[in-house]
């Protein structure tokens, strides 16, 4: 093969969302000749020397690229990741970590679709069956009925985690795969919620929803429904925090109506003082197993609070969440134990995907290499992951 071009090495690393330091660690590039691993990698990217094949193989694995990609003459154009619902057309924001994550998701989706087609799965009629000019209450009822969602059961959950598990089961029961992914396999590559909150990939055979698990757990249910509405509309794309885009407002309104019907917000008085609003919204959200941000957004949309009040509340709730997140991180660091590798992985990929991969392996329709690719683990970890899932019911 021809020589590897330095710009290809740099492109592959940057589109994988890795810094020089993280990439050097990922490919196990050790210090040598007075240079750190990161400095050696930087030299390779400047064309100081050709990387040995062994290093290229490690790069292919760490950067999630086929080996042949490192012999391209020039970096290819960015792949289609669907619509960017976070901003107006022409103002899309590029983030290498997010781009790498979506490329990984798309690759998994292709394998999932292949497994489903081998099993002769029927197309899902609801995907792309709705339009954004449908009245919000009508589509909300249609989606909730299709899910057979009972708000009483959702709210009877012990907390936000259990409520999300109930909703996730309902969504996956309709043929949609719900994944929790917020990095490229390591906390070093965490993608902030400010970059993306959720992703919907529309397909009538293998529709996918991805939720950024860096977000508050109380927000996961709303994000799942928001992305599900995108699937009903036949949309593929990235969702963020800003709801300034019309289609995002519509999906927010439908998701919000499913979880908290507008009639339930009538008890909130207009003109609440800030501290009163914080307490009332917090109590209301806790009782319904939803996020305070969602409730305050609905109050804004209904004209029950001003935009300035909503902005102040959003800032306050976000600061409290960041403080809570830091406390939880400190607890985990101090604790001796914690969730095992397989418990965490099971939770991220969901019971529906675990079940599909298990059946496909049993029927000989997929290799362990491809199964690992779909589940986001190495081939040798597939069987322990599936076995532990079967023993514990997949949750």
How should each PLM-predicted stretch be described?
Residues 1-395:
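Active-site hotspot residues in diverse enzymes, especially metal/ion-binding acidic/histidine motifs
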């Amino acid at each position: 093969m021809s020589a590897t071009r330095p710009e290809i090495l740099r492109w592959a690393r940057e589109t994988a969302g890795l810094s020089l330091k993280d990439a050097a660690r990922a490919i196990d590039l050790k210090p040598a000749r007075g240079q750190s691993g990161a400095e050696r990698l930087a030299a390779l990217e400047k064309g100081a020397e050709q990387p040995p094949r062994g290093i290229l193989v490690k790069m292919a694995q760490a950067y999630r690229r086929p080996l042949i990609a490192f012999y391209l003459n020039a970096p290819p154009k960015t792949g289609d990741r669907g619509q960017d619902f976070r901003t107006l057309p022409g103002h899309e924001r590029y983030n290498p970590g997010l781009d790498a994550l979506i490329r990984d998701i798309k690759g998994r989706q292709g394998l999932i679709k292949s497994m489903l087609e081998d099993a002769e799965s029927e197309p899902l009629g609801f995907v792309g069956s709705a339009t954004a000019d449908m009245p919000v209450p009508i589509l909300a009822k249609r989606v909730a009925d299709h899910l057979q969602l009972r708000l009483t059961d959702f709210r009877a959950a012990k907390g936000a985690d259990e409520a999300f598990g109930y909703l996730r089961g309902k969504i996956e029961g309709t043929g949609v795969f719900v994944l929790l992914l917020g990095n490229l396999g390591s906390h070093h590559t965490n993608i902030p919620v400010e970059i993306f909150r959720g992703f919907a990939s529309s397909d009538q055979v293998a529709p996918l929803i991805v939720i950024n698990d860096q977000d508050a757990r109380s927000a996961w249910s709303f994000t799942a429904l928001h992305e599900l509405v995108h699937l009903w509309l036949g949309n593929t794309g990235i969702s963020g925090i800003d709801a300034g885009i019309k289609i995002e407002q519509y999906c927010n309104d439908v998701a919000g109506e499913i979880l908290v019907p507008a009639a339930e917000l009538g008890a909130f008085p207009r003109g609440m003082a800030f501290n009163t609003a914080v307490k009332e919204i917090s109590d209301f959200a806790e009782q319904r197993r939803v996020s305070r941000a969602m409730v305050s957004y609905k109050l804004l949309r209904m004209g029950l609070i001003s935009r300035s009040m909503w902005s102040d509340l959003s800032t306050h709730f976000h600061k409290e969440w960041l403080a809570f997140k830091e406390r939880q991180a400190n607890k985990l660091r101090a604790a001796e134990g914690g969730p095992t590798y397989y418990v965490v992985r099971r939770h991220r990929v969901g019971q529906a995907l675990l079940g599909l991969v298990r059946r496909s392996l049993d029927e000989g329709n997929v290799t362990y290499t491809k199964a690992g690719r779909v589940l986001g683990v190495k081939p040798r970890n597939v069987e322990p992951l599936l076995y532990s899932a079967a023993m514990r019911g997949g949750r």
